[in-house]
Amino acid sequence: VASSIVRYMRYREIDPETPLLFGVGNVTELIDADSIGINAIMACIAEEIGVDLLFTTEASAKTRGSVKELKVASYMAKAAKLKKTPPKDLGLNLLVLKEKTKISAEEPSGKIIEGKKSDEFIRDPKGDFRIWIWRDKIICKHDKATIVGKTAKEIVDTVIALNLVSRLDHAAYLGRELMKAEIALKLKKNYMQDEELNFGTYK
């Protein structure tokens, strides 16, 4: 990557007029890292060099969303260049899993009880649910109905309205699983019922 960037820089020094195409997809597809950060840095490098066109692909699951990411990154890079500032505090960003500021939390007081996981399982007499993601929707299947939605709340609210759950522990389980599915849907991650989401080094 570094040697290719050097060649781009040298060419631009020789010829400042001919439009240049930057194949960002060649980088995002060939490294097992989240595309959003790679697209951000590559767009900034391209802007500094004077590249005119950015090209990317969404050929694999790990690069889904790259077109949108690179579009935002190019806006950030151009705005930073015009303002003569680093690409931050611009009114738009590519922060997804991290945030710039930390909200201070209230320190707990009074009687504090350490939470403990219960291994007890009692099946809900109203039946079980199967949950999965299909075509950018969360599917929640019960013997009496299949509920489809994009958020945990709209599905849970429908489950309650249809009176499909009778136990508090089952309702709590359903809420946890549906929220996992919603997060997976937003981040374009795999979702498997009863399995933790894979956050790599952030386990």
Predicted regions and their residues:
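Active-site loops and adjacent core secondary-structure elements that bind or stabilize anionic groups
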Residues: 74-135
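Catalytic alpha/beta core domains of metabolic enzymes, predominantly
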Residues: 1-96
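Weak global preference for isoleucine
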Residues: 5, 14, 31, 36-41, ...
